[in-house]
Amino acid sequence: MNITDIREQFPILHQQVNGHDLVYLDSAATSQKPRAVIETLDKYYNQYNSNVHRGVHTLGTRATDGYEGAREKVRKFINAKSMAEIIFTKGTTTSLNMVALSYARANLKPGDEVVITYMEHHANIIPWQQAVKATGATLKYIPLQEDGTISLEDVRETVTSNTKIVAVSHVSNVLGTVNPIKEMAKIAHDNGAVIVVDGAQSTPHMKIDVQDLDCDFFALSSHKMCGPTGVGVLYGKKALLENMEPAEFGGEMIDFVGLYESTWKELPWKFEAGTPIIAGAIGLGAAIDFLEEIGLDEISRHEHKLAAYALERFRQLDGVTVYGPEERAGLVTFNLDDVHPHDVATVLDAEGIAVRAGHHCAQPLMKWLDVTATARASFYLYNTEEEIDKLVEALQKTKEYFTNVF
């Protein structure tokens, strides 16, 4: 894996910000886009922009082939059994809401339980809050260990015969914790529950095999894996999807419309009302091609090395608190003593370094950590150890500045 060659494929990285070479350490928020994806979008809009499925003209056929070809690429990428199990959405948030609206509200009743964790992104909390409110079910939380990991014993104690849904992030966007999805799926299934996985932070960085994980639903976003914004995927087991009603209605998803009744298309199109995100899906297909050419195992090893190096360098700084386990995905969330995370991010930006600051759409986790906000540096395939060195040097400057000035 030649990082220099990889970086050459990302035009945005070759610029200066505030007089410094850009160091982009915010890929957990959104990844940068390789030239191959940008050119694919350009080609679509310049050469075969058209609506899909119903047109018999050449442009329509090419657009349909590109759109459905992207669906097949996603299917292979996550090893789903059938293209019928791959639904294009606006992103992970929409995918999770779709399950909460179409599956949860139809299957929950008073006395039932939905189980989640304290580390969830708001997109995997609020839909379940609304689902239990609408159905009279109960929302429960799996506790976290001191290092921000989940104990399978705690999962077994929390998930009961009353549990109908277990919803969990594969990788925490704050702690970098990689959750044991396969083992959690077995516990859920042994209790008659389904498991819903937020894969936004795992799919870009490691091989995903939904059949091996045995998850019932899996959500992902294109923009975090070198693809365009505005498009994502919901994977669902075919038997579950077939019994679910659509959450949205309109064109594209219908089979027949009468004056008082209508019927829906078969999977997956019954869940894709309206003109779909055609360019986005085709761009996602190009991103998958790009990632597979490099290799997800190679990417995962590179990021694991970066995370370990970052933790080692952070230990050399005084007055820094790092959150999360030793073994983690490629991100480090931290705070400098007596310096607000937004101030940290502002000073780093002056050095050309982009990090994220705030609650990271995880306010319950912030409360568990007993902080209001943190700073986060997140890594991807195009980052280097030299960039981590620049980050640590800039943090040392930041610490000295606030110590001396204030």
From Swiss-Prot:
Regulation: A Cys to Ala mutation in SufU (Cys-41-Ala) has been described to be a competivie inhibitor of SufS activity and a non-competitive inhibitor.
Active site location: 361
N6-(pyridoxal phosphate)lysine PTM positions: 224
Pfam families hit by this protein: Aminotran_5
Keyword vocabulary terms for this entry: Pyridoxal phosphate, Transferase
One GO BP: cysteine metabolic process
Needed cofactors: pyridoxal 5'-phosphate
Catalytic function, reaction form: (sulfur carrier)-H + L-cysteine = (sulfur carrier)-SH + L-alanine
Gene3D superfamilies, A to Z: Aspartate Aminotransferase, domain 1, Type I PLP-dependent aspartate aminotransferase-like (Major domain)
GO molecular function: cysteine desulfurase activity; pyridoxal phosphate binding
Function: Type II cysteine desulfurase that acts as the initial step in the SUF-like Fe-S cluster assembly pathway. Catalyzes the removal of elemental sulfur atoms from L-cysteine by using the cofactor pyridoxal 5'-phosphate (PLP), resulting in the production of L-alanine and persulfide. Activity is stimulated by SufU, which acts as a sulfurtransferase that receives sulfur from SufS via a zinc-ligand swapping mechanism and transfers it to SufB.
Family: Belongs to the class-V pyridoxal-phosphate-dependent aminotransferase family. Csd subfamily.
Protein's name in the database: Cysteine desulfurase SufS
Organism of origin: Bacillus subtilis (strain 168)
Lineage: Bacteria, Bacillati, Bacillota, Bacilli, Bacillales
Gene: sufS
